[in-house]
Amino acid sequence: NSLLSGGSTQYGTFTWSDTVKDTIPTVGTYSYKVVFTPSADTEKNYETISTTEQDVSLTVNAKSLNDARVTVSGSYTYTGQAQIPAADAVTVQLDGETIPKDRYTISASDNTNAGQATVTVTGKGDYTGTASGTFIIGKATPNPTIPTELNAVYGSTLKDVLLPKGWAWDTPDSSVGNVGEKPFAATYTEDNRGNYNTVQKDLT
């Protein structure tokens, strides 16, 4: 919204002309018509005073997004690649209004590994400045090959039964027990454990 003030030495009011009063100005400097309407007292005291229309120059500056609130919807899981939320997933609000998506660009940082990532919007067109929000990249769940055909000797413990890389018995000191097939809990952990969940399985 634009506020109009006048510098005339005569008493009266300034208003936007009917031809431009509903115009929403964009960033830049433009000419708009303004109407000066003298008050009743002014008309009595000045014979030549009448309603006057004049072009005035109006400069509209871009609005800063620095205080905007940025939120990100959706879920994100580690893929090994940098992830930038789509425009539809990003909402920017300023002074209670949602900023149109074509008024800013979107970038992200710390957005490859699992954990908290940052999304930054940069104003363009009618907006300037930047604002940031966060989103979470969750750990991925691996799909390891499940060890099979494991064999143990009576009287031994689980730690005597070797497992493929990444797998470990949950209770390595436990006895394998009597002869026969039995399940024992084991956990698979990726080398890049910060980005992957562990996988637990009962192995036989």
Segments and roles (model prediction):
Residues N1-T204:
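Solvent-exposed beta-strand/loop surfaces, strongest in extracytoplasmic domains of secreted
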